[in-house]
């Protein structure tokens, strides 16, 4: 039989592009995003200077780190785009009708962007960062969510401690775009008057009557007390758990790797080797550094591997061993050099270079698995004061990615050299990083991200050993949502029905029909070796 070479080539290219698009979709939707069976809108509530933006940014950073696509929509940004110059607190008076119209219009524009993010951009959670202090505004948001079948979870920040409020104004609001080139006294005076404007119409959530059926958490006086009401699902329970662990007290987190090991010298990954001579020198230098810093109540954590324990032993302090701080499990590639892996497992070597974050070693872990494993460490770090974590390269990359808000593309390639300390100091909306080298030579274990200079059509198609089940379709928007028991959508599946109608469907497909249709899709090729 004769065939058309051009047609065959075109089919191959189309096949590759289809698989490539699937991989892009897989990259956007990690295991954690499947914890949300419908998009969720987190709505902040509270007077100005109550830490709403702090909580919004911190919560968003955490959710993105665990793999749930999340984005903050700050209403102040929309307001500043609509009103180029801020003059005084008069803009926020409830009897300023013109300003009230502008503020409502800004809210509607922001909600339109929320809808686009959750329905068109593969977002799973949107954080609506605004005061939302009136029931009228909250009802507007609830109606918006009902129309789009979004779940809603309110986070109200309540604070009546004047010292905390004043500290927040001085730390954050003085540098706000609303106050260019103003002195502290004028800023404080204007902002306190702005708060009074909001107090006139402030209607806190009422768990006993008007708001008893809403899902929310009240955070009182920066975590002194909490009130939780009607949590709907797993992701909301994770949000509550996270918010109950964070604090704003000053502290410093120190991250470093163990001293250089014998396997580092040999270029081998994994294993449980001891320190080299230079590694022991680093341990002594680390002890001297900590003594000079005079850090109060410092806790030291290590993994359960020999090289971190030997590093901590030289410090002359008590330390805790965490098994979940052990290095990433390289499976069959443990105690091998990269050259040996490339020679013995060339396909695996290429697969890991293709997508390092998602790639899982045969019989081992991926970076995505490691992030899941390290979540309890992050929770405990958020609860603690001053801590030194002595860990490993992959582990340290995951921890750094959380504090520095780095995504899956950057995480596996963060530079974490041996004999270097990362000093992390939490600040208002992020983390200040200082890098301290202790002047003890060590081998370089970093591998740069490989560059692929081949045209897409010439790139070999490989099946990834993913850390999650690949999607059967790259179209994440039209994928039917299965709502959990006890938390039905406010308006069940209306967007899907509309889509089916547009395509000429007589009636909405049932779950069984959807499942049968999925089984008719071509199955992906089996992995190169079992996970």
From Swiss-Prot:
The keyword Transport does not apply. The keyword Nucleotide-binding applies. Residues 451-477 have a biased composition (Polar residues). GO terms for cellular component: cytosol. ATP binds at residues 46-54, 168-173, 349-352, 393-397, 429. Residues 446-531 are annotated as: Disordered. It comes from the Eukaryota. The record marks 257, 264, 392 as: Transition state stabilizer. GO terms for molecular function: 6-phosphofructo-2-kinase activity; ATP binding; fructose-2,6-bisphosphate 2-phosphatase activity. The modification Phosphoserine is found at residues 467, 484, 494. It holds the Pfam family 6PF2K. GO terms for biological process: fructose 2,6-bisphosphate metabolic process; fructose metabolic process; glycolytic process. It catalyses: beta-D-fructose 2,6-bisphosphate + H2O = beta-D-fructose 6-phosphate + phosphate; beta-D-fructose 6-phosphate + ATP = beta-D-fructose 2,6-bisphosphate + ADP + H(+). Keywords: Acetylation, ATP-binding, Hydrolase, Kinase, Multifunctional enzyme, Nucleotide-binding, Phosphoprotein, Transferase. Synthesis and degradation of fructose 2,6-bisphosphate. Homodimer. Forms a heterodimer with PFKFB3. In the C-terminal section; belongs to the phosphoglycerate mutase family. This is 6-phosphofructo-2-kinase/fructose-2,6-bisphosphatase 2. It comes from Bos taurus. The gene is PFKFB2.
């Amino acid at each position: 039989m004769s065939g058309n070479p051009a047609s065959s080539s075109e089919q191959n290219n189309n096949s590759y592009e289809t698989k490539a698009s699937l991989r892009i979709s897989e990259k956007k939707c990690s295991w954690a995003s499947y914890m949300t069976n419908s998009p969720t809108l987190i709505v902040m509530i509270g007077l100005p200077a109550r830490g709403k933006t702090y909580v919004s940014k911190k919560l968003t950073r955490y959710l993105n780190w665990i793999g749930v696509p999340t984005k903050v929509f700050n209403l102040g940004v929309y307001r500043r785009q609509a009103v180029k110059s801020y003059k005084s607190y008069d803009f926020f008076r409830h009897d300023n009708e013109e300003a009230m119209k502008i503020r409502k219009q800004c809210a509607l524009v922001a909600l339109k962007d929320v809808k686009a993010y959750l329905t068109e951009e593969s977002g799973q959670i949107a954080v609506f960062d605004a005061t939302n202090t009136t029931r009228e505004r909250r009802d507007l948001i609830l109606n918006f969510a009902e129309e789009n079948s979004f779940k809603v979870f309110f986070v109200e920040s309540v604070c009546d401690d004047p010292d905390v409020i004043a500290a927040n104004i001085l730390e954050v609001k003085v540098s706000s775009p609303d106050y260019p080139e103003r002195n502290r006294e004028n800023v404080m005076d204007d902002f306190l008057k702005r708060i009074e404007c909001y107090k006139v119409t402030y209607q806190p959530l009422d768990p006993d009557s008007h708001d008893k059926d809403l899902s929310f958490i009240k955070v009182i006086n920066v975590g002194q007390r909490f009130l939780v009401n009607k949590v709907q699902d797993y992701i909301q329970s994770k949000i509550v758990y996270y918010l109950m662990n964070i604090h704003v007290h000053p502290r410093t987190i120190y991250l470093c790797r163990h001293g250089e090991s014998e396997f580092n010298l040999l270029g081998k990954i994994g294993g449980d080797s001891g320190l080299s001579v230079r590694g022991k020198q680093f341990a002594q230098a680390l002890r001297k550094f900590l003594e000079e810093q005079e850090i109060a109540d410092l806790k030291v954590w290590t993994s359960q591997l020999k090289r971190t324990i030997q590093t901590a032993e030289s410090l002359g302090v008590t330390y805790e061993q965490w098994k979940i701080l052990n290095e990433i499990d390289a499976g069959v590639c443990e105690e091998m050099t990269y050259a040996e892996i490339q020679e013995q497992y060339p396909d695996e070597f290429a697969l890991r270079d293709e997508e390092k974050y998602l790639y899982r070693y045969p019989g081992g872990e991926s970076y995505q698995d490691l992030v899941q494993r390290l979540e309890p460490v992050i929770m405990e770090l958020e609860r603690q004061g001053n801590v030194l974590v002595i860990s490993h390269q992959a582990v340290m990359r995951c921890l750094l990615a959380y504090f520095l808000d780095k995504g899956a593309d950057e995480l596996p390639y963060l530079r974490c050299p041996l004999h270097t300390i990362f000093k992390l100091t939490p600040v208002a909306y992020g983390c200040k990083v200082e890098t301290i080298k202790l002047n003890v030579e060590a081998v370089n274990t970093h591998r740069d991200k490989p560059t692929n200079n081949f045209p897409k059509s010439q790139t070999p198609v490989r099946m990834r050993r993913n850390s999650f089940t690949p999607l059967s379709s790259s179209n994440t928007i039209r994928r039917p949502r299965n709502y959990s028991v006890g938390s039905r959508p406010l308006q069940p599946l209306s967007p899907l029905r509309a889509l089916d109608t547009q395509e000429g469907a007589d009636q909405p497909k049932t779950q069984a029909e959807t499942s049968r249709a999925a089984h008719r899709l071509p199955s992906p090729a089996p992995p190169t070796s079992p996970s």
